[in-house]
Swiss-Prot record:
InterPro entries xref list: Aminoacid_DH-like_N_sf (IPR046346), Glu/Leu/Phe/Val/Trp_DH (IPR006095), Glu/Leu/Phe/Val/Trp_DH_C (IPR006096), Glu/Leu/Phe/Val/Trp_DH_dimer (IPR006097), Glu/Leu/Phe/Val_DH_AS (IPR033524), Glu_DH (IPR014362), GluDhGdhB (IPR054867), NAD(P)-bd_dom_sf (IPR036291)
Catalytic residues (UniProt): K119
Protein name: Glutamate dehydrogenase B
GO biological process: glutamate catabolic process
Length: 429
């Protein structure tokens, strides 16, 4: 198992799009200006603790063998074990994993969870794998990462191209090597295999909670609020359903194929998520259709980019008409776009706060696994609501007291907590 040196991004310009690592480092430096924290701590947080690279040989169904590259970036563990997703995607790279692991560190800290950040994955298009090949890939990847992961060391979770079944296979492969069942090695498992109720809906639920609180903060009655959601997968669909149930008017939703628009409000319960029915959005009977780009520029109270990164850029930030942007995806707004939106006084509720429901309920799952005690769905929802409101109030206080953007305020909360932990622990040796 090789450990690759931390990747070094070339100095970034304002050209679009940025890599996840460039964006994460820019955001760190911007927030550091507002925090009384040692320069040495910021320098340490600019780099990961380690990046592990492994080769993952897999026997294909036809008997041939394909070797895939796998990565695990572990950013910082001063507050607890590393935590972050595993993705199967052709675009996985060491640099991407480092950038995403940094976001996980901030996300865990802003939620005050006892974890640090990690991210990993395999360079593969999961659509090219049969179910059996997917399982063999996962089990071999788990075997290669055995020394790097564990309930007190590094706890993976689902991400792009992986799901609850992937996590069950990973947990089983790890457990077979350990000689005992270790459900806490991963989160996002099926409830029958040590998973938690409410995990799948958690990121969307937290986005909905953040949207509700933002609407309230800016004195918009929720019954009058109009919402557009780009990305109707698990995050976007669950957020839209909840906001619809709470009284907001969801006027547009989209998936990779395009979107639908009804200014009177869509019946979100009549539109299956992209994961359940990939073509359902465009088949929905609505007065108008639109592109993903057009959805982002609708004149609504809230736009929720919940699909992929780098969709709000310097090229379209001037055309965003929403009063509030709530980030459902990871990194949907580039740094250049952030500056433009801030100049235009368009608040952006950042991803590290808005979509933190996934890692928060992963924490609940980890607690349930460690204690061998299952929580009810109602308890999971109530605990998530409580954790989200606590984090929201901490960030809101920084916004109000420090005259900061929501992103800078969230980073300030995270960096203060990480800085205090590093100061208390010191630097060894």
């Amino acid at each position: 198992m090789a450990q690759t040196p931390p990747p070094e991004s070339a100095p970034s310009t304002d050209s679009e799009p940025e890599t996840a690592l460039e964006t994460a480092r820019r955001q760190l430096q911007a927030a550091a200006e507002h925090v009384d924290i040692a320069d040495g701590v910021i320098e340490r947080l600019t780099h990961p603790t380690r990046v592990v690279q492994v080769s993952v040989p897999v026997e294909r169904d036809d008997g041939t063998v394909t070797v895939y590259d796998g990565y695990r970036a572990q950013h910082d563990d001063v507050r607890g074990p590393y935590k972050g997703g595993l993705r199967y995607h052709p675009g996985v790279s060491a640099e991407e994993c480092v950038g995403l692991s940094m976001w996980m560190t901030w996300k865990c800290a802003v939620m005050d969870l006892p974890f640090g950040g990690a991210k990993g994955g395999v360079v593969v298009d999961p659509k090219t794998l049969s179910a059996d090949e997917h399982e063999r890939l996962t089990r071999r990847f788990a075997a290669e990462l055995r020394d790097e992961v564990g309930p007190s060391q590094d706890i993976p979770a689902p991400d792009m191209g992986t799901d609850a079944q992937t996590m069950a296979w990973f947990m089983d492969a790890y457990s077979m090597q350990q000689g005992e069942t270790v459900p806490g090695v991963v989160t996002g498992k099926p409830p029958v295999a040590g998973g938690s109720h409410g995990r799948a809906e958690a990121p969307g639920r937290s986005v909905a909670i953040a949207t509700r609180e933002a609407i309230n903060y800016y004195d918009i009655p929720i019954d009058d609020a109009t919402v557009a959601v780009q990305g109707y997968g698990s995050v976007g669909a669950n957020a839209a359903l909840l906001l619809d149930d709470w009284g907001a008017r969801v006027v547009a939703v989209s998936d990779v194929n395009g979107g639908v628009l009804d200014t009177d409000g869509l019946d979100t319960h009549a539109i299956p998520s992209h994961g359940n029915q990939p073509a359902a959005v465009m088949r929905h009977d609505a007065p108008n259709t639109l592109t993903n780009e057009e959805l982002l520029e609708l004149d609504v109270d809230v736009v929720i980019p919940a699909a992929v990164g780098n969709v709000i850029t310097a090229a379209n930030a001037d055309r965003i008409q929403a009063d509030i942007v709530v980030e459902g995806a990871n990194g949907p707004t580039t740094s250049a776009a952030d500056r433009i939106l801030e100049e235009r006084a368009v608040p952006v509720i950042p991803d590290i706060l808005a979509n933190a429901g996934g890692v928060t309920v992963s924490y609940f799952e980890w607690l349930q696994d460690i204690n061998r005690r299952t929580w009810s769905p109602e308890r999971v929802r109530d605990e998530l609501e409580s954790e989200m409101l606590s984090a929201w109030n901490a960030v809101r206080s920084e916004v109000d007291d420090g005259d900061l953007s929501w992103r800078d305020a969230a980073y300030v909360v995270a960096l203060q907590r990480i800085g205090r932990a590093k100061e208390a622990r010191g630097l060894w040796p």
